Amino acid sequence: MGVLFDEIAEHGTPTTVHLDRPFDLGDDRRKFGVADLAELVQELAGWLAAAGAGHRDRVAIVKENHWDYDLLSCAAVRIGAVPAKLSDRLPSNTVEALLKRLDPKVLVTTAAVLEHARAAGIDLASFAGTTLVLDGAVPGTLSLDDVRGHTAPGPRRRHDDEPLAVMHTSGTTGTPKLVVHSRNTIIGQLARFETVRYPVIGMRGDDTLVNASAYAHGRTFCWTASAFCLAPREIVVISQQDADRADPVLRAHPPTVMEAPPATYVRFAQLTERLDNPFRRTRLFVSTYDAMHPPTIRSYLTASHRKRPLWMQGWGQSETGPLTFRFHTRSSVDPKHSGRTSRNVGYAVPVKTRLRVVDPDSFEPVPRGRPGLVLAKTAARCLDYVGETDRWQAKHWGGWWITGDLGVRNRDGSVDLLDREVDMVPGLSCLRVEDILEERLPQVLECVVLGQPGKAPLPVVVTVDGELDNASWLRATHDILPLQAPIALTWDQIPRTGTGKVRRLALLQEITATDETHGTGRWT
């Protein structure tokens, strides 16, 4: 990854990158060729070396969302260091806990991140050997003026099984884990698999690929390697979840292939209803991180003017990469198909992944059609958790990885995802109920069903204004098992992870003052 752009530039790859806003690197450009990116990564490597980073040192990166997270990571890899991307959307005390585990030689951040933490009584710079601030001068830290012009040492190779990068899990159930991947696991097993030009879904030379991700997530590090190897004509990077800000960028560069996490698709869905919507040329939508609700998928497939647009849904984890995949068409999410949801996350990735569903207590395999704990076996499994090796080891059983998800293996081999074990409600799939409610309540942006011991499930609905019509709610829930009265909130009132996923335990605690659930949380 340290010489990725150098090698691609040598092949004369004509890909052009367009940004929705400049990088947070003191550079006002919004357009880059591959050779420009190679030069930028070399320059960043010089900055990190000047800040004191070297072979096997950890470099923590905490900043506002943008793809420069991955360019800084490539620069760290180039000098033999190990980058660790941390989302600035994490609470400051969580960032503090992660930095203590990492013990980084260098922290790369911004003045706003430091000030936000300082307001909470936390000095993030105190947890790193040196802190490099990208956008100004902060006492006790280095600024860009202190490191510019430093020549980095030549690229340093490492063994394929040595730590290459650290990325954190979503943290939906508490403090995220720090996942360690090697070149073999994240590049050799994951990125290389994505560089194959598969029929129909494979990248083409005339494609415009748009990515609107959470760039602190490990997915985009892998994506960076695969996307540039496939050499589309244009790559468009969107760093903001504000649909009105994204709209002009999408209209200037209408995507033929679009990738984003579920939360971003939900936020951008309003664009599908606008005149001459920006998704009219899109032939493939890619959703990562989590399953999505059918109404959102339907809105994008309907917006495309292509004859047969596809939605590719992946389910996996930071520790393993993708475990399953499934394709949706306009027909598969047609509301006329009563009861159909997107909880079926498809089939295990061929050749790469094996899945098994077992009883959570005995770990004996359960028959097809019965719910159980989902186990996975893949060569892409991470190496460890930083500072939590015991926790990493506890998620292994007989050579299998314990995902912590509950699911059903169907007769055809596909998997229905039910719930995280920690979020489960006996006799109910919260995720399926959420699918049904979102289908019946088009004014709802998102629905979250929370389980509480001794009480009926608690539904939380997200609307634009935080209001919900009671009559509509009663009609939507007339044939669903008893639920508590719904709580309506706005999008920004919901605690979320860096990828926009709902932090269910935090939400439960905010509403009920308790985080007690039906699940054990043994495999979080």
Give a label for each model feature.
Residues K31-A35, L164-A191:
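Conserved AMP-binding A3 loop
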Residues A45-N93, N211-A214:
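Conserved AMP-binding/adenylate-forming
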Residues I187-T208, A216-V257, L271-T272:
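Conserved AMP-binding/adenylation subdomain of ANL enzymes
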Residues N344-K352, S362-A394, S414, G427-L428:
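Conserved ATP/PPi-binding loop(s) of AMP-dependent carboxylate-activating enzymes
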Residues V448-L450, V460, S472-T524:
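Conserved C-terminal "lid"/linker of ANL adenylate-forming enzymes
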